């Protein structure tokens, strides 16, 4: 009976987000706005009116696309906060617009796209000149992107 069971594809069950009361959110923190993981860049609260609660006005920048999102919610309501992980990987190659990254476990991942714009150009330039660099990869809500580079410690 136990031979037919296959548990390899299960994940740890960790949620992509966790709830936090609107009034507990802070500037430079993270929040999900319009379904996107955002960094809070501006936050203001309005006073309690005759009817209802104090409102919190949030402005956030999408951590992957850089687009600006806004939302207003009562201060007592819960908002989703994305679980964000930052990992550094050693760059060992670039092929067809994808990065080859060496993980701590010794495995190589080749599923991460070379970022567009200045960061992508800088990564290519440093790789072509033979520099050993670490790529900082940000993951949140099933998305991942290379967001920064730094020289490897010798």
From Swiss-Prot:
Modified residues (N-acetylalanine): 2
Keyword Transmembrane helix recorded: no
A GO MF label: ribosome binding
InterPro entries reported for this sequence: IF5A-like (IPR001884), IF5A-like_N (IPR048670), NA-bd_OB-fold (IPR012340), Rib_uL2_dom2 (IPR014722), Trans_elong_IF5A_hypusine_site (IPR019769), Transl_elong_IF5A_C (IPR020189), Translation_prot_SH3-like_sf (IPR008991)
GO biological process: positive regulation of translation; positive regulation of translational elongation; positive regulation of translational termination; translational elongation
Function noted in UniProt: Translation factor that promotes translation elongation and termination, particularly upon ribosome stalling at specific amino acid sequence contexts. Binds between the exit (E) and peptidyl (P) site of the ribosome and promotes rescue of stalled ribosome: specifically required for efficient translation of polyproline-containing peptides as well as other motifs that stall the ribosome. Acts as a ribosome quality control (RQC) cofactor by joining the RQC complex to facilitate peptidyl transfer during CAT tailing step.
Family named by the database record: Belongs to the eIF-5A family.
Record note on quaternary structure: Binds to 80S ribosomes. Actively translating ribosomes show mutually exclusive binding of eIF5a (EIF5A or EIF5A2) and EEF2/eEF2. Interacts with DAPL1; interaction takes place at the polypeptide exit tunnel of hibernating ribosomes and prevents translation. Interacts with DHPS. Interacts with SDCBP. Interacts with DOHH.
Protein name per UniProt: Eukaryotic translation initiation factor 5A-1
Species, as recorded: Oryctolagus cuniculus (Rabbit)
